[in-house]
Structures are given as C-alpha cells and as structure tokens.
Swiss-Prot record:
Recorded GO CC terms: cytoplasm
Name of the molecule in the record: Serine--tRNA ligase
Subunit structure: Homodimer. The tRNA molecule binds across the dimer.
Annotated organism of origin: Streptomyces griseus subsp. griseus (strain JCM 4626 / CBS 651.72 / NBRC 13350 / KCC S-0626 / ISP 5235)
Record's comment describing the protein's domains: Consists of two distinct domains, a catalytic core and a N-terminal extension that is involved in tRNA binding.
NCBIfam families named among the record's database cross-references: serS (TIGR00414)
Pfam families, per the entry: Seryl_tRNA_N, tRNA-synt_2b
Length: 425
C-alpha cells in the first residue's frame, strides 16, 4: 500500500498515478474521505475514553446525591464509548479496504499507456536469418516432440488444456536450467530457497495478487489457501511482521518453486505448446533493500537477467513496461523479451519490478536505522521461467536436421552434451 502521508500531502500525484494506470481516479477522493473519517472517529473515541476515565475518578469522592447523577452519566458514557469504538473500527476497516484497492505510485519515467505502449531500452544478440541458412525453422512443440522432450497430448489427457509433460531431455533440460540459474544467483550473493507453493490469504493479498489479479489465482476454498503464481509471494512474506536492522540490508533470496496460474482472459492466446501454461517451475530473485537503494537494485536485477539471457545465447530486447501493464505492486517494471523465430517477434521471458515500500507496508516488513523504524523496499526479478526459456532455446538454437545445439553455458549441467538429437520413433 502507499504511504498515507503522501495521499494527504499530495493527492494530485496519487490521482495522476491512478489516471496513468487507467484506474479509477475517484478512488483517491473516496479514500481521502474515509481516512478523514477514520481519524476523526479515533479522536472522538479518545475524547470519550478520557471523559470516562475522569468521571471514574470523581465517583468515589462524590456525595451520595452527586454519585447518583454521576453513575447515570457514566452509564451513558459507557454506551457512547462502545458506539464510538465500533464507529472507529468500521471507519478503519473502510479506509483499509479502499487503500488496498489503490495501486502503487508509478515512477515518473514510466511510459504511459497499455500493454503495447512500452519503450524499447536495449537490444542484444543477433536474430538468425533462417532463409539465408536454407531452412524453415520449426516451432518449439514440433522440435520438442521430435526430441522426445515435450508431451502435450498426454498432459491434456491427464490434466486438460495448457498442461504438459517434460520427458527425457526435456526433463533434463529443465533441471539443467534450474541448476545453472541457482548457480548464477548464488554466485551473485543470493541465498537459495525452496519455498511453499501454498500460502495464506494475507501473503497473497500483501503482495498484491488479490484484487484485480485474483481471477488468475487458484484458491483452495475449503482450506483457504492460495496456490502461488510465483515464489515472489512466499519470498515477500518471509519477513512479514519483522523489523530488520539496516546494516543487514540488502537481503537477497533466490526462490525455486512451482507456479500456478489460471490464465483467465487469455482464451485463444498461445494455445500451442508450452509458452502459456497453468503450471510451471521458476527461479525468482527477490531483494529487501533500503528505499534509497531501490532504483539501483532494480538495475542490478535487470543486469543479472541480461547476464542470464546472454549466457543462453538468446537474442533479446529490454523494455520499459507501460503504466497500464505494471500490475498493482510495481512502480516500474523492466521486461526482457527473447526473440521467438516462428512467431517473428519478441516475447517476455523475465520481469524485474521495483515495488518500493508497497508490499512492505502491506506485510509490515520494516527496517531499523538508529531509532528510526520505517518500511523498507522490496524488488523481484525472474531469473528463469522454465517453459518459456525452453521455448526460446529450442527455437533459436535449432539445426536443419531438427536437432538443437546446447548453449555452451548449459553443457556442464547436461553431462557435457553439445547437441540434443531427435529420438527414433
């Protein structure tokens, strides 16, 4: 959530942020009114409690005649205090409900617009000219089936659409990618973690994945648990309700977990293959930092993502994601998009988001510097979303005979194998 002081002192900035996101600007004024009511309700309750305490001191000293009148007044005050307490709680709940609907304040440099209004910041690598090489590229599913690496048919038979099996070299390729990603993260100073896939509502809400994003989340209603769509959720909640000494920052974690996404609203998109699926594995970087270091850490996360994609020898571009595509928690987001030859365009492989103090406030994660205690900043960045990375590797490193060259960086994790070859049918 945003800092309420900012809302009170500069509501126009909050309105501008909501407008840039394409969200309801009226929410700002509703929240201002609710916040004022919450504060005035609190003052009213405190005044009545003070009057009640003062009256309580007078009663023992009063004469019999005075005591009767004071006791009547005390009875009325008791009812008034109870009503004021209820009004205070109701006002606080209403203000919190509205506050949780408000997105983070967008960074001033973020391009304004929707999904297609991003700005390309960098391009890396060379896009292959398959025509000049004399063959038509196959898509990742055709390649994966020939390699004995991907089985969509049985995935659909067992679990339905957007499910799959990784088999043989496909399974080995996932394990190689995960181990290589964890190795890079560990070398960069991240603490590796295997995180829970089920979380309580507060963790999901605290990271901003309920509200508008709730339609893409799997909810186990009987137990009131949520399946995570990213290990960002359990990593952000790891230090929930804690105060961290400033001299221990930054704290960096690399989480590996299964991820579950309903993919609501994507009917008809990416229906072939494993680019958009309901379940996948991912290595995620997560940082807790001093707010003053948040922008620099954001660039560091992006640099680690670029290092990873460069090591995989993939052509990619870096984009500054537009305001309408940020998600509620991020103030700014950089995506790395790899070139997918058979689609003829760049597609998202990684995201790096600066959430400032937005998640930390919701989850009550704070830092202590001297006598000062304040929310810290949280940031997250994809290192390896496995299926999409496999898609990019298969398509960009395919050879004319349907085999796939293994990027040099991955070879030690695949027993030295240099080429993945089609299996005999």
């Amino acid at each position: 959530m945003i800092d309420l002081r900012l809302l009170r002192e500069d509501p126009d900035r909050v309105r501008a942020s909501q407008r840039a996101r394409g969200e309801d600007v009226g929410l700002v004024d509703a929240l201002l009114s609710a916040d004022e009511l919450r504060r005035s309700s609190g003052v009213r309750f405190d005044e009545l409690r003070a009057e009640q305490r003062s009256l309580g001191k007078l009663i023992p000293k009063a004469t019999p005649e005075e005591r009767t009148e004071l006791l009547k007044k005390a009875e009325q005050l008791k009812a008034d205090v109870k009503a004021a307490d209820a009004a205070q709680d109701e006002a606080a709940a209403d203000a919190k409900r509205l506050l949780l609907q408000l997105g983070n304040i967008v960074h001033e440099d973020v391009p304004v617009g929707g999904e297609e209004d991003f700005v390309v910041l960098e391009t890396h690598g060379t896009i292959r000219d398959f025509g000049a090489e004399g063959f038509e590229p196959k898509d990742h599913l055709e390649l994966g089936e020939a390699l004995g690496a991907i089985d969509m048919e049985r995935g659909a038979k067992v679990s339905g659409s957007r499910f799959y099996y990784l088999t043989g070299v496909g399974a080995l390729l996932e394990l190689a990618l995960v181990n290589a990603a964890i190795a890079q993260a560990t070398e960069a100073g991240f603490v590796p973690m295997l995180t829970p896939a089920l979380v309580r509502p507060r963790a999901m809400e605290g990271t901003g994945f309920l509200g508008q994003a709730a339609e893409n989340v799997y909810h186990l209603e009987k137990d009131d648990y949520y399946l995570v769509g990213t290990s960002e959720v359990p990593l952000a909640a790891y230090h929930m309700d804690e105060i961290i000494d400033a001299d221990k920052l930054p704290l960096r974690y690399a989480g590996f977990s299964p991820c579950f996404r309903r993919e609501a609203g994507t009917y008809g998109k990416d229906t072939r293959g494993i680019f958009r699926v309901h379940q996948f594995d991912k290595v995620e970087m997560f940082s807790y930092v001093d707010p003053a270091d948040a922008e620099a850490e954001h660039r560091r996360l992006l640099d680690w993502e670029k290092q990873w994609l460069t090591a995989l020898e993939l052509p990619f571009q870096v984009i500054d994601v537009a305001t309408g595509d940020l998600g509620s928690s991020a103030s700014r987001k950089f995506d790395c998009e790899a070139w997918i030859p058979t689609q003829g365009k760049y597609r998202e492989l990684t995201s790096a988001s600066n959430c400032d103090g937005f998640q930390a406030r919701r989850l009550s994660v704070r830092m202590r510097e001297g006598k000062k205690v304040q929310p810290l900043a949280t940031l997250n960045g994809t290192l390896c979303a496995v299926p999409r990375t496999i898609v990019a590797i298969l398509e960009n490193h395919q050879l004319p005979d349907g085999s796939v060259r293994v990027p040099e960086m991955l070879r030690p994790y695949l027993g030295g194998r240099e080429v993945l070859e089609p299996v005999a049918k």
